[in-house]
């Protein structure tokens, strides 16, 4: 009997955890628009450092200082996305050009 109930309990536990995570994400504004996401990020940035300090005092060890970066990861991410999308948008014409060059090369070889 327990062997038949265990998979159901296991599945129910997984569904409950996933549903709870989805509820928390929706409630905190992570699944909304970019404005709601920005507000949620600002709340997280203001809440995380005090929590880390509290846990460091509780456990008695100290984390190293976060390194300062000279560039914005957001800009780097956006430029990478823009380059990728640009490469995908010009891919059909580029493939056509390479095909023409390849056919011309084969024609020149056969002469």
Swiss-Prot record:
Component of the mitochondrial contact site and cristae organizing system (MICOS) complex. This is MICOS complex subunit MIC13. The chain crosses the membrane at residues 8-26. It holds the Pfam family QIL1. PANTHER family: MICOS COMPLEX SUBUNIT MIC13 (PTHR31816:SF3). GO terms for biological process: cristae formation. Keywords: Membrane, Mitochondrion, Mitochondrion inner membrane, Transmembrane, Transmembrane helix. It is found in: Mitochondrion inner membrane. The gene is micos13.
């Amino acid at each position: 009997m327990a062997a038949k109930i265990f998979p159901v309990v296991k599945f129910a536990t997984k569904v409950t955890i996933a549903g709870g995570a989805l509820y928390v994400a929706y409630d905190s504004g992570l699944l909304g628009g970019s404005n709601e996401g920005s507000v949620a990020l600002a709340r997280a940035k203001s809440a995380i450092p005090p929590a880390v300090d509290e846990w460091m005092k509780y456990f008695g060890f100290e984390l190293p200082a976060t390194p300062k970066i000279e560039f914005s990861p957001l800009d780097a991410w956006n430029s990478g996305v823009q380059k990728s999308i640009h490469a995908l948008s010009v891919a059909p014409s580029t493939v056509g050009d390479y095909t023409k060059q390849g056919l011309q090369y084969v024609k020149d070889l056969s002469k």
